[in-house]
Amino acid sequence: MRTLIKGGTIVTAEQEYVGDILVDGDVIRAMGTHLDEAADRVIDAKGKYVFPGGVDQHTHFSALCNVGNRDTAGYETTDSAIVGGTTTIVDFAPQDPDRGLLDSIDYRINVRAKDKSCVDFALHSMVTYIMDSIFDEIEEFPRRGISSIKIFMAYNGSPLHVDDGTFFRILEKSRQVGATVFVHAENGEILNFLRSECVKKGQLTPHYHYVSLPPFTEAEAVRRAIYLAGQTDTPLYIAHMTCREAIAELQKAKGTGQRVSGETFTHYLTTTKEVLDNPDFNEAAKFVCSPALRDREDCEALWQALSDGLLTAVSSDHCGIDVAELKQAGRNDFTQIPNGSPGAGDRLHMVWTEGVCTGKLTRQKFVDVIATQPAKINGIYPRKGTLAVGSDADVVIFDPNYEGTVHLADNPNGVDYNLYEGRRQSGRVETVLLRGQVVVENAKFVGRYGQGKFIPANMYASGYENRN
């Protein structure tokens, strides 16, 4: 099947021009101006932007949410992500209670995602049960196509928490095999103390979620993680950065040439902590996430850090937890609200609306942070994350003239709310190709459930490149 996309404004992280793209089978065969090639289908993209398919490097599909042993929304709900212009996710493969790292990865590929995923996917390994065998398993990552591993400095007292000694050992082992370490950087011991103090005082509404997760606990953990990674010369990627204090620590480290970078999320760029003050529990609970939402000055600092290249990706942290049932667990105690919100289907248009349309990001920087850098960071570039001859034909045709409002009904996500319901939306994903197949047309999913496949990642990804 040959498809010719004609006359669109092609935007990559490096350039922008009006041109054509010839897709042949799964890949891009030719790019240029005034291509005159035979094709089975011609798509008129005049007046539209043509982007590489988005790469969302931080999602939690089909993950245990610790309320009644229920999972978050599964891979069958990735249709929302692809309608929103994301063609590849890098999902987390948490270590299951009765499995090692590798068995958990295999189970996710062959059971959880099989015949369900609408998007292609790579995987991060994620340590949740510390045992000596995990260090031997990390040595197998290159043969399994796993280029990254995530650890949690927070959640002391739970299986998720990794102590500093184990963190250091994981850094050393990851460096040996060429893996990048992702870190959730919050001081878990202090957070536990602050949360317990709120409970003792009867401060139980969602407002106190923010109060008990202050910015300094993030900044301190970022500083400590950077220092430990520096001792092993292991590339470090700091997940979900939210505040000025943490950004300052990142900037200092990069100034010394250390191999460290970070991401932020759509909601940290577009929403502030005041939403947690809503007297309607259901509305406030939607926004309970970790780290907590911050203030307007932090939002602006995040936008600036993206523009400057200090932060390299915008992710969604998609976590499909409904309000009507699961978040009710914390109605009388905010510490029991399961953290997380859906967002994979809204990432592109929200970053476009709040970033590009306001002049905070250029179009090329937009492509860089929603597609190119996430692909590079995770070892799947240039197969993913760009428009280039030989790359997978993952293509988004975007209508910049669309003006509307975000509604769950327009792009259902498998749970009972959209985090951005009622917000202004400028621009819309109109058509999406996944490996050459049209899977979104007129902003509606027309693909096949199970069309997505596992994408093995290459080791020694961009974090291992020359020091900054």
Name what the model sees in each region.
Residues 45-116, 133:
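Metal-associated gating/positioning segment near the N- to mid-region
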Residues 8, 21, 26, 47, ...:
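Divalent metal-coordination and catalytic microenvironments
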Residues 90-91, 122-125, 235-240:
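Short catalytic-loop micro-motif centered on adjacent basic/acidic residues
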Residues 1-52:
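Histidine-rich, glycine-flanked metal-binding segment
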